[in-house]
């Protein structure tokens, strides 16, 4: 991308990943507009005093407001959705309108406004269940839930509008983990770490399911790379982005090891196993993004657990079981999904 093109609209920029990414974009000289409904923390976790940051509180389904937000932007980074199956299933009509029906109008608005690049955060969960040893981007999509299905359905809705003046790129991130200012504690690594630190035990649901993982800082680094990469390297491309394909039980063992090292005064952390109806299991291959863009993760699941331990130690995550803001489904219930 032209080095002079440094204006980006981050839709969903107030969320878990956006809260870490946005300050870094500002530090790197971007003019950033965050468009977000801001029902979790408001804008308190964003650097509101930075003159290069503009925050628009809005609904992604509001086509007119989205169109105005796109004016003057060089790039759009679309991170917004009702995230995870439990939140989605609270109100399928609402979730369908947000996660699927609003998507193409946003793409059309961006193109009409003269945006040059559109980056969409899909999900590696579009693969559902696969016994393939390496799931590449060409693997058939076999989503198990509507949340995952709609992520996959949005991808061609972007691709059909791209051309030489409107570059589209899609990435399929793995389950994200680690500390960010707008913290989530309803994701696998983060859940297990919270329980290990604060309940001094780990409960594993199932255990054999394979899951790829992605540190939230690597997620942010990937977004920055996709914003800066030359058009010819990313145009109409889909990239897996998930590393450390671990079973849920192996994740639990990593969490146990790290938490016992970080909090030796708490003694041994037991692992308890219970049944699960979450059948998602897949081992993704992310070599394409390494070949095309040289992207490799710099952070591990162990790093994510250590970062969370430090956040707990510093009191950055108070009331980690009772504060609804850490849990998407509970926040949606609290504000009244409609």
Describe the residue ranges of each PLM region.
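Active-site helix of classical SDR
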Residues: 150
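NAD(P)-dependent short-chain dehydrogenase/reductase
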Residues: 156-211, 216-227, 254-258
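NAD(P)H-binding glycine-rich loop region in Rossmannoid oxidoreductase-like domains
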Residues: 60-98
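Conserved Rossmann-fold NAD(P)-dependent oxidoreductase catalytic core, especially the SDR/UDP-sugar
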Residues: 104-146
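C-terminal substrate-binding subdomain of Rossmann-fold SDR/epimerase-dehydratase oxidoreductases
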Residues: 200, 205-338
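N-terminal Rossmann/SDR dinucleotide-binding element
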Residues: 2-75
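Conserved catalytic-core motifs of eukaryotic protein kinase domains, centered on the activation segment
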Residues: 44-46, 86-93, 129-133, 181-182
